Amino acid sequence: MRKVLYQKYRPTKFSDTVGQDSIKRIIVNAITQDQLPHGYIFAGERGTGKTTFAKIIAKAINCLNWNGDVCNQCEACQAINSNSAIDVFEIDAASKNGINDIRELAENVFNLPFKFKKKVYILDEAHMLTPQSWSGLLKTLEEAPDYVLFIFATTEFNKIPITILSRCQSFFFKQITNDLIQQRLAEVAAKESIKITTDALVKLADLAQGSLRDGLSLLDQISNFSESKTISLADVEKTFNLLDKEQKFGFIEAVLSGDLKQSFHLIDNFESQGINFVHFLRELFALTVDLYGYVKTGQIAVVKPSDQTMAAKLRFHPKQYALLVQAIEANTGYGPSQLSLSDQIKAIVIHYNNAVSKEPHIPAYTPVVQTQSPAKEHVPSKTVEEAKPQLPAKEPVLYKVIEEPKVSSFVKDPVASKLIEQPQTIVQPEAQQEITEVEQPTETSPAPATDLFGLAIKPEVVRKRGRRPLSVENTDFFQPAVKKLIQPVSKPAPIKLIEPSDNNPVSIPIKLNRAVIAVSVYGHNDPKLVAHFQQLLDSFKREFTQAEKTKDSSYLKQFSDKFTASDLSKVIKVLAASPFGLVLIFEDKEIATRLWKEALTEATAQATLLEIFQQNLFLSSFTLSEYETKVLAKVEQLTHKPQVLQLQQLEQLSSTVVKKAQKTAAQEIADTFFKGLYEEK
């Protein structure tokens, strides 16, 4: 029966192996010097030579004619090659991974070899062993006799217990380069009389993805395509359902041109042709990386020779290629880890250049050269009177304080005017930071301590209460803030800050009032956003209700805070919505009060809002009666839009819990290039 190519041409000695030269050198020296450990761990991708090396090592330590390599002629070598050696045990750890199997192995370890010098245990797919099995191996591995060697082969090194790692030597088998795979495929094709072009071999090596075994399997498969003519690149693409270069470049051009209709049309065509999308994504990523390098450097040599003609015809900005690279990586598993090492480095360079381009200015680094100070000249001593500095008659004025003109309130009710004054920036409430003020030497009375929400704490309140916290619901503590600007008159000078002290009390940041949020949201209310958020909320409530009926406890695990999610399931409706906030109506007053406070102070609560509504939002929640008494009148008195509430603090709050950005790079590309669904250009 004919052997498949990867079995027929599997290396049987060290000199036949490719791509793992450093590992080969270390192991050969260890065998020659008789300094083998009790165990080896071989980790790496499939088809990189782990099991092959293990079997060659088993021959090497038992070879009767060892001279830097195995002879493949002695009794030991031939027995191992034919899989009939009774002292070499090749175990499939994926199927024999139970504690009973390991106990049986441990009992036999201390028996002397029957025929050879050493016994070898090769455990393939070792990461499949159970924790109990690993525990059973610990003592055996540590106290193994000198005539026993363990070799663990795995594709998932991270699953090997640290206690095992500390008792073995670990080697990481890298993927075989495309050049080495192509060279080996050419040698095998010549020996098997397979007529195939160089371009076809290059494509097969690329399809192998660093696995020499996969490359030989692909060559074996394509060898049956035709017995009479030479196999070409087109034959390979047709056999394995691959895109030709015209189709790949056509797709990239459609995407980067913003032609959504053509892009979707091409994808549908690819699907009807049975295209291998797994390989297509990997090729698309690698090709886009090369095109970015070409456009950025102007050097066509960075693109593969077969793609250079098509690459020269494209006319796109490097930023567009960078965005496409990020979109593929963010939405699929085909990022840099699937590329060759050189392409991985190129992808890193793209990410760095793209990040640097967003920075407004990065100053050049100038190294500080330390020089030896010259010897000081002798200065005659002066009397105390002579040494006094001569002060000017009057210090020049560097700054003066002016008052910004007051803006008349657009709300008749003075209390409402305090509520709807909006912040310049927002301070996280629980931070309890203290705000230092610029010294005002011209003022006789203490200036009102201003917060960052457009309100000021009344001076008499500051004098009476000092540093004690203020109630956010009591509006009698506050008055409209007077903004003070520092304006340079002559030359700039450092601003002197007053340090906080008992004689100079400073303001304490206050929490946002939910009425403030509600009025701001209403000032920017968008009916489309109301419908959008209501739809998201209804969908969430349906799933939540269904999970409660079926007692599906796993449903709530997807949310950062199950209590916040449970509260939100009791919303009656979305009353108003803006890009930065929501107004929600509840029946339960306790839930409404608790929810808006937690949304401002609790990272898990804000993260749950982000998970349900898909963006960070200020939340204002009421019962219907509360809304009518606290907000409705103020909303009706609005004469112009209030300021927008900034979301930076909420984003920082939720980012401590939610690790992934909600908006992917693919969505960024869609926003940039796709100007509407199925639009004609």
UniProtKB/Swiss-Prot annotation:
Species annotation: Mycoplasma pneumoniae (strain ATCC 29342 / M129 / Subtype 1) (Mycoplasmoides pneumoniae)
Pfam families listed in its UniProt record: DNA_pol3_delta2, DNAX_ATPase_lid
Domain of life per record: Bacteria
InterPro entries in the record: AAA+_ATPase (IPR003593), DNA_pol_III_sug/sutau_N (IPR012763), DNA_Rep/Repair_Clamp_Loader (IPR050238), HLD_clamp_pol_III_gamma_tau (IPR045085), P-loop_NTPase (IPR027417)
UniProt GO cellular component terms: DNA polymerase III complex
UniProt gene name: dnaX
Name of the featured protein: DNA polymerase III subunit gamma/tau
Binding residues annotated for Zn(2+), in chain numbering: C63, C71, C74, C77
Function: DNA polymerase III is a complex, multichain enzyme responsible for most of the replicative synthesis in bacteria. This DNA polymerase also exhibits 3' to 5' exonuclease activity.
